Amino acid sequence: MNQFKKDFYKKISFEKDIIHNKNILSNKIYNQNILVIGGAGTIGSSYIKQILKYKPSKITVVDINENGLTELTRDLRSSNLLDYNPEYITYPVNLLSDTFDKIFNSELWQVVSNFSAHKHVRSEKDKISVEALIKNNVFGAIKLLNLCELNPPKYFFSVSTDKAANPVNIMGASKSLMEKLILSKKNKFRVSTARFANVAFSNGSLLDGFIYRLNKKQPLSCPSDIKRFFVTPEQSGQICLLATFLGETGNIFFPKLDFDKDQIYFKEIALDFLKENGFEPELVLSEQEAKKFDFGKCPTKYPIYFFQTDTSGEKNI
């Protein structure tokens, strides 16, 4: 499984920008007080790992996922990233709560980075879900920007998505509005954001789901007509790091990717995934057929169902 990830990541690797800007990043991050909201997720935790390399004096991580914060702490302590003994604090708190206000107003922050977001199109499946999405992506941003306006940080960053460009769904539209709200503050304090595509094997992603399905001996399914740009979890943190500290206020950062060469079909990844794990893909015609597959009779084969997308909420690239 890990080897498959390594081989997959080789296809989408980039490191030059971090190396080229190493001294600039060090000068801007060293000995700073940093607040990260939504830091227990895939992108937020990767960002924290990147930023700790430049030795801030203090880093405070806020996330509603208490288990995620626990795992982040274990991960950081098991590495050498906290060996220089920075002040490191975590709070299992919602950005929209009064408790968060107390945390924010308790001290001055040089860097405020926000990764708290609803990121999936499926988050708009009903009215309640849409309400939660808008509260998080839009009203959460408004609240955070208003707090920052009272006590401006040196750097404010909030992650966006490629779906914010010409949005075709509510999630993308909410992030597009979030971007506009952020840019409206560009003359009051330094603000930036970053758009990028799918983070490969991130929590809750389709590729991450492949691993769960395989471990549970459940069929795989994925769209046959959708291809995407991918970045690795590490690269997602690097992009956000660069966007936070480089460029001008009001900039929207995104990776330079080749439209023709760098997109990958989910179908191709699924087939490679099964082959790398020692299985021969067994193509089935329906979800029902996939569920009836007898793993005992065919131990070297694995059922996979490909379907054509039929929702206007998803872009085809």
Model-derived segments and their meaning:
Residues M1-N33:
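Non-catalytic terminal and boundary segments that flank Rossmann-like NAD(P)-dependent oxidoreductase
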Residues L246-I317:
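Mid/C-terminal beta-alpha module of Rossmann-like enzyme folds, strongest
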